[in-house]
């Protein structure tokens, strides 16, 4: 059976990462609460190193490698944010990195991978399997794969987001009525769910994915990892991955009381604007997907307290400008 993530994994990751990464703020604004009709607490992972939560899992996995593996180098496949994170983690630990990216990856994410010193390799999602592309490099060069979500070390690192949220909410004497998390492969969702459920056993989790993909909605019903063809034209690149991870799914199913929502481009762009206007932060559309989903379902949460993970802020200027004028 695929192993599930535990709170002990996350606590160990938090100890490992404490010397390398700073906590991100949990933001709340009266004007945002008024707009939603409920108290909204947004975890600003857009302010983390590399502009997204992904550095937590990537660095936790990198620090677990032995010196020989680091010298040979690492590889990953990514829509961009995990690629940046692996590139940064490799740079910080003295390892070479190769990042396999879709040809449609946002320019800012490609540039940041290269800024951190990584080699970038592109593939066509319509014709190629990203894991097979990475597999060729692994076979030829002996590289170590840092999987974007189906790896307990990565999941544990992402779970430190939830651990911080628990501490920050407790400081304010707030018990959340619901948690909303953007979701693609499931590394962040499984990590946050594990941390939050350790504190509050009954809080429901709402996963948010890209409309037209809905692999998690299906996976929660079939209880099997789902595979989908990525969308060809979307600003939700950060949650446009083709597959549900086996380990994240096992963790989520073991916890239960999990629901799946989906949002489209227009909704996500609207949420980018909401975050900027009320919280003064920059989220990418995928990073604002949870906020968009809550907005679409806000009538069901009137008067409640909702934790939303703002997972990243790596957005091209043109897309951000489009969001502000939507």
What do these predicted regions represent?
Residues 1-326:
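PLP-dependent amino-acid enzyme catalytic core
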């Amino acid at each position: 059976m695929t192993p599930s993530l535990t709170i002990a994994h996350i606590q160990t990751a938090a100890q490992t990462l404490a010397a390398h990464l700073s906590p991100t703020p949990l933001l709340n604004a009266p004007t945002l609460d008024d707009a939603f009709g409920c108290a909204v607490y947004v975890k600003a992972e857009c302010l983390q190193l590399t502009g997204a939560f992904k550095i937590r899992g990537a660095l936790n996995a990198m620090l677990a490698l032995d010196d020989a593996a680091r010298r040979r180098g690492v590889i990953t496949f990514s829509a961009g944010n995990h690629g940046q994170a692996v590139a940064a983690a490799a740079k910080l630990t003295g390892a070479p990195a190769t990042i396999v990216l879709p040809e449609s990856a946002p320019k800012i994410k490609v540039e940041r991978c290269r800024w951190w010193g990584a080699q970038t390799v592109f593939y066509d999602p319509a014709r190629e399997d990203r894991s097979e592309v990475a597999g060729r490099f692994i076979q030829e060069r002996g590289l170590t794969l840092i999987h974007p979500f189906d790896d307990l070390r990565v999941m544990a690192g992402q779970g430190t987001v939830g651990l911080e949220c628990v501490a920050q909410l407790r400081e304010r004497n707030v018990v959340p009525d619901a948690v909303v998390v953007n979701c693609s492969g499931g590394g962040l969702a499984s990590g946050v769910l594990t941390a939050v459920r350790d504190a509050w056993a009954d809080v429901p989790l709402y996963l948010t994915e890209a409309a037209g993909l809905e692999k998690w909605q299906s996976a929660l019903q079939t209880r099997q990892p789902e595979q989908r063809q990525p969308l060809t034209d979307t600003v939700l690149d950060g949650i446009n991955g083709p597959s549900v991870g086996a380990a994240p799914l096992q963790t989520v199913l073991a916890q239960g009381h999990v629901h799946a929502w989906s949002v489209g481009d227009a909704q996500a762009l609207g949420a980018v604007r909401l975050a900027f206007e009320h919280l003064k932060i920059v989220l990418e559309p995928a990073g604002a997907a949870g906020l968009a989903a809550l907005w679409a379902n806000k009538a069901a949460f009137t008067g409640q307290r909702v934790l939303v993970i703002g997972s990243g802020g790596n957005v091209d200027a043109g897309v951000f400008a489009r969001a502000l004028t939507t």
